Amino acid sequence: MTRTVLLGAMKDKFADIYTVVREAQKRAIGKIRSGVRMSEVDFAARGYIHSRGYGKYFGHSVGHGVGMKVHELPSVSRTSKDFLKKGMITTIEPAIYIPGFGGVRIEDMVLVTNKGCEILT
């Protein structure tokens, strides 16, 4: 689980970035259910971030599997050919990082179900 904390007054740009990342996460989580290709989940978040003008500031995958280790395959990425399966636990962690300004990442773990997912964090 990752949260972003701001110390001090919030600038409009930071508020916009936070809102974009939060919405990107909601869109990705909305795609999760057994049988969906992981790249579709990635695109739901990545496409939204790109549409808001921040695409070049999101340089990693949307998430990854969680099991005995914190970071496990399969990856929720744009190149993944894997499908979500009931019972999988994965992270959904879109982010925007702007050099010289700062960044926002919001990460939650979800349990994949047949009809969607259960947010665990």
Where are these regions (language model features)?
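Active-site neighborhoods and metal-handling regions in enzymes and metal-associated proteins
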Residues: 1-121
